[in-house]
Amino acid sequence: MGCFGSAGAKGDAEENKKRKEANKNINKQIQKDKQVYRATHRLLLLGAGESGKSTIVKQMRILHVDGFSEEEKREKIHAIRCNIRDAILTITGNMSTLTPPIALENPAHQFRVDYIQDVASQKDFDYPEEFYEHTEMLWKDKGVQACYERANEYQLIDCAKYFLDRVHIVRQTDYTPTEQDILRCRVLTLGIFETRFQVDKVNFHMFDVGGQRDERRKWIQCFNDVTAIIFVTACSSYNMVLREDPSQNRLRESLDLFKSIWNNRWLRTISVILFLNKQDLLAEKIRAGKSKLEDYFPDFARYQTPLDATVEPGEDPEVVRAKYFIRDEFLRISTASGDGKHYCYPHFTCAVDTENIRRVFNDCRDIIQRMHLRQYELL
């Protein structure tokens, strides 16, 4: 009897020892995971639809991961073809609906328009050679070009000109997209996408969420324990309206959205890095002079370039005035209700320019590090 008792006690002791060891290992792993979690900078990308958020994520992959594999590049071919089809369909489809309407320079091209509208619009369209032929010929037509110039009067993807200029390349059977093609390619973001990368042994998790109005309800899921918000706005959208609501100016929507995020009670301690994006397109519009900023934002007529403005060599003074006016519209919101718990850090960006994003993100890293230290009360 005693023998059995001592064997049982010994077994219990062994079991306890194993259990303690297992608990110790679990606790050790929990502590390790906690350290990794606390050492990770979580960045939430917010902004209205088509502001350039997903392009910023692609740049992080190019700059800090391994870019895109040959297979991933080939997988983008279909999306790029869709962009070309969407662009030529939209432009030719709006020629007759504009006020005043626009006619083809060469009426003999009408059969090409009919093909685009009737055949290329079909769901199971497979991009035969004649599609590229018709698209290239139409894109050279001055009437089609004139309709493109009035793109702010209807909804057209930003990359339309970029890809329509490259149809002769995309149509090749051995075509492989370049990094610039992938950066320019427009695909609607639905849901939440996380990108992980490391810079100088510091871990970053970047969350990209859809910017269209019906996607924004998902944002709240990402607010927990965020280091910083990167708010992206398309500065070139000052003369455009929303896809979801043609009565609302896109830049005004972006300002309203920024205000709601800045004043959100759950985000009062999270600072915002403001990416004033699409500076290249803004400069083009201002220099062209067809869509005047003051026609959409009357205060611009009285606005003077601030003393803190940095002017790039050869930069048009009117472009400088425009970009700082838009910056100050956002800063008016952040300074009006700032309580010293969170700050707004503006940067002028061109999301398709890898060197620009490299420089801007390097400038932001110190800011993000300070936010991270403050988040865990180490500063």
From Swiss-Prot:
Stretch list, region G4 motif: 273-280
Keyword list, A-Z: GTP-binding, Lipoprotein, Magnesium, Metal-binding, Nucleotide-binding, Palmitate, Transducer
PROSITE patterns from the UniProt entry: G_ALPHA
Lipidation (S-palmitoyl cysteine): 3
Region (G3 motif): 204-213
Residue ranges, annotated region (G1 motif): 42-55
An example molecular function term from Gene Ontology annotations: metal ion binding
Region (G2 motif): 181-189
Boundaries of every G-alpha domain copy: 39-379
Chain spans, region G5 motif: 349-354
Residues lipid-modified (N-palmitoyl glycine): 2
Known role: Guanine nucleotide-binding proteins (G proteins) are involved as modulators or transducers in various transmembrane signaling systems. The G(s) protein is involved in hormonal regulation of adenylate cyclase: it activates the cyclase in response to beta-adrenergic stimuli.
Family membership: Belongs to the G-alpha family. G(s) subfamily.
Stated name of the protein: Guanine nucleotide-binding protein G(s) subunit alpha
